[in-house]
Regions:
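N-terminal amphipathic, basic-rich helices that act as targeting or association modules
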Residues: 2-88
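Cofactor-binding active-site loop characterized by glycine-rich and histidine/acidic residues
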Residues: 48-164
Length: 164
């Protein structure tokens, strides 16, 4: 490290399990570092970062609280999940997002075991979580399934049907 440069807390984090031993203050610091790095990276590479910036704290909190990938977090749209990609071992690949042979701009199950659902069309995460939860009730009832959905997606008919 160059003299005068402060080591980032996120440099010591490789996977979500590394978040689980951190204090609330450390988690807040990690969220700030992730947000700043996402802005820098996406400003150069392109992409949609507003939804991920808005979901930074919840992403860090969910990966801190739940045993991912054993527990499943389902993101409604890929734009919410850039920070998720960063904390699940893909941080140093973020410059390749949405490029040929780079990271997908969406959630992609073949890209990571932490991508439990291949989100594409908005409004599907709650329905997918309900279905996944019913399947897990038979196989592994001690697992949790969490759906993350934004305000725009929450207005879709499929989301309302799942809530019903």
């Amino acid at each position: 490290m160059a003299p005068g440069m402060k080591e980032k807390k996120i440099d010591s984090l490789k996977l979500p399990e590394d978040l689980r031993s951190l204090s609330l203050q450390e988690l807040e610091h990690v969220a700030e570092e992730l947000r700043n790095e996402l802005i820098d990276t996406v400003s150069e590479s392109g992409g949609h970062f507003a939804s991920s910036l808005g979901a930074t704290e919840i992403t860090v909190a969910l990966h801190h609280a739940f045993d991912t990938p054993h527990d499943r977090i389902l993101w409604d749209v890929g734009h919410q999940a850039y920070i998720h990609k960063m904390v699940t071992g893909r941080r140093h690949q973020m410059g390749s997002i949405r490029t040929n042979k780079g990271l997908s701009g969406f959630l992609k199950r073949s890209e990571s075991p932490f991508d439990a659902f291949g989100a594409g069309h908005a409004g599907t995460s709650i329905s997918a979580a309900v279905g996944m939860r019913h399947a897990l009730d038979k196989l592994s009832p001690e697992r949790y399934v969490v759906a993350v959905i934004g305000d725009g997606s929450l207005t879709s008919g499929m989301a309302f049907e799942a809530l019903n």
